[in-house]
Regions:
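Phosphate/nucleotide-binding beta-alpha loop and adjacent structural elements of enzyme active sites
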Residues: 1-186
Length: 186
């Protein structure tokens, strides 16, 4: 799971329903480490890594807070950042080398890098049963973002995924669920 911040109900419910699941999270924000530490004090056994997703592993990049609460950061510099921290990056290829390629669920909420990660999943030939993605349309040109969204949805559909809207948001985000029915149990 990528992008933790203060919200890990999904991960906690995965643990409640599967005691043996290996749950891994990546998010370099200080709040995310506190969130996971709190959950783990309750016995949830979540393995957390303080790194940001990017196409290249091992880079040190600026991570910008997009609001003054410092709960949401992104790699793309916003017009008026409220804070910045330096973070190390990691990509899916490196993660697969470290943890293996057998994955059931990939969840991502990684402000502005959704297209890169959804593409890397396909390029690596990973075979998750479900991918949950928050796709921010407000980072960059709106029309270009929607063209990328249409393109990635089509690529997933071509290899047997059914794509659903997970939740209608109030902002300029699209939450999608990419599901492989023959692999997943609802």
């Amino acid at each position: 799971c990528f992008g933790v911040s203060r919200e890990i109900r999904f991960e906690l419910n995965c643990r409640k329903h599967n005691e043996t699941a290996k749950i891994l999270t990546w998010d370099p924000t200080p709040l995310s480490q506190l969130t996971v530490d709190s959950a783990n004090s309750g016995g949830y056994r979540i393995e957390h890594t303080n790194k940001a997703y990017d196409k290249e592993s091992g880079k040190i990049l600026k991570f910008y807070a997009i609001n003054d609460s410092k709960k949401c950061y992104q790699l793309d510099r916003p017009e008026n950042p409220h804070d910045e921290i330096e973070v190390e990056t990691i990509n899916l290829k490196t993660i697969a080398e470290q943890h293996g390629r057998d994955v059931d669920v990939i969840k991502l909420d990684i402000e502005g890098r959704w297209h890169e990660m959804l593409t890397e999943i396909l390029d690596l030939g990973l075979a998750p049963k479900i991918v949950l993605a928050e796709c921010e349309m407000y980072i960059g040109d709106h029309d270009a973002q929607f063209l990328k969204l249409d393109s990635i949805v089509e690529r997933y559909q071509k290899i047997g995924f059914t794509v659903f809207t997970n939740r209608k948001t109030n902002g300029e985000c699209v939450e999608l669920c990419f599901l492989k029915y023959n692999e997943a149990t609802l």
